[in-house]
């Protein structure tokens, strides 16, 4: 199994495209991470929108550059709004990304996410346990936490990618991005990133934005993982703990975006 690495030039090119196109991302995400997700997108040069009412969600999915579905705080009314948005995104050819939070641990959200797969997401982003559960090869995870190493989920990610046509991202100490055939590994980051709520969910929003960019979508999505890990490393170097990490992380994302424009 060959795992390719992403070059700095590829990452910088994708970030230049990101800033140039400034995708409008319709984030139907969980209640815990909305502010952090919006600020992450803004720092990189995208435009976030959080539209959740069913009628409006469907309408906005046709306007947005990309749609994110994150099931972290799923309720039945929210599931209805998400389904309506995904159906409209499919009709409008708006790329959409699924973040199947805790799908391996809870039955209702697993059934819901499996139903959404029939609408062919452009990308799927999860930890190893979530990806393995969604692929039907394992049940597990400890809520939102993974109990599996990212590398162990590569076969499941490849299967899921081939079955759905999505680009699948498995995040962990090393992130793996696959279209079912090619695999790109992204190293970096810091364990402190796991002590801040929302870094994975925010990455899913950046992945969604990258689905709206021209060029090689696999490389663009892998670049999103690289930016987040780079920013995490820079932020940790300036931080004393999780509380001071967040503002330094947002600053680091902003600085990365500015550097490619220089």
UniProtKB/Swiss-Prot annotation:
SUPFAM superfamilies: Ribokinase-like (SSF53613)
A GO biological-process term: thiamine biosynthetic process
Record key words, sorted: ATP-binding, Kinase, Magnesium, Metal-binding, Nucleotide-binding, Thiamine biosynthesis, Transferase
Cofactor requirement: Mg(2+)
Disulphides: none
UniProt-listed CDD domains: THZ_kinase (cd01170)
One Pfam family hit: HK
Positions contributing to substrate binding: 50, 198
Catalytic activity, as annotated: 5-(2-hydroxyethyl)-4-methylthiazole + ATP = 4-methyl-5-(2-phosphooxyethyl)-thiazole + ADP + H(+)
Highest taxon above the source species: Bacteria
Keyword NAD annotated: no
Residues binding ATP: 125, 171
Gene Ontology MF annotations: ATP binding; hydroxyethylthiazole kinase activity; magnesium ion binding
Pathway the protein contributes to: Cofactor biosynthesis; thiamine diphosphate biosynthesis; 4-methyl-5-(2-phosphoethyl)-thiazole from 5-(2-hydroxyethyl)-4-methylthiazole: step 1/1
EC number: 2.7.1.50
HAMAP family registered for this protein in UniProt: Thz_kinase
Function: Catalyzes the phosphorylation of the hydroxyl group of 4-methyl-5-beta-hydroxyethylthiazole (THZ).
Protein name: Hydroxyethylthiazole kinase
Organism: Escherichia coli O6:H1 (strain CFT073 / ATCC 700928 / UPEC)
């Amino acid at each position: 199994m060959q795992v390719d690495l992403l070059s700095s030039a590829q990452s910088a090119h994708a970030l230049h495209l990101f800033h140039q196109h400034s995708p409008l991302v319709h984030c139907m995400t969980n209640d815990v991470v909305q502010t952090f997700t919006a600020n992450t997108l803004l720092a990189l040069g995208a435009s976030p929108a959080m539209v959740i009412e069913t009628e409006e969600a469907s309408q906005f999915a046709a306007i947005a550059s990309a749609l994110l579905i994150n099931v972290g705080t799923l309720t039945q009314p929210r599931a209805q709004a998400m389904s309506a948005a995904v159906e409209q995104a499919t009709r409008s050819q708006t790329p959409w990304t699924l973040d199947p939070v805790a799908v391996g641990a809870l039955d209702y959200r697993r059934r819901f996410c499996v139903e959404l797969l029939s609408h062919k997401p452009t990308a799927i982003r999860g930890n190893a346990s979530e990806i393995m559960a969604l692929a039907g090869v394992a049940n597990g995870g400890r809520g939102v936490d993974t109990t599996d190493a990212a590398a162990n989920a590569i076969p499941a990610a490849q299967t899921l990618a081939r079955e759905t046509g999505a680009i699948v991202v498995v995040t962990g100490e090393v992130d793996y991005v696959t279209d079912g055939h090619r695999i790109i590994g992204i190293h970096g980051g810091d364990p402190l990133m796991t002590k801040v709520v929302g870094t994975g969910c925010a990455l899913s929003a950046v992945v969604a934005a990258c689905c709206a960019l021209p060029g090689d979508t696999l490389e663009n999505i892998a670049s999103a993982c690289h930016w987040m890990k780079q920013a995490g490393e820079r932020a940790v170097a300036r931080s004393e703990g999780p509380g001071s990490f967040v503002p330094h992380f947002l600053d680091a994302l902003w600085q990365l975006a500015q550097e490619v424009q220089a």
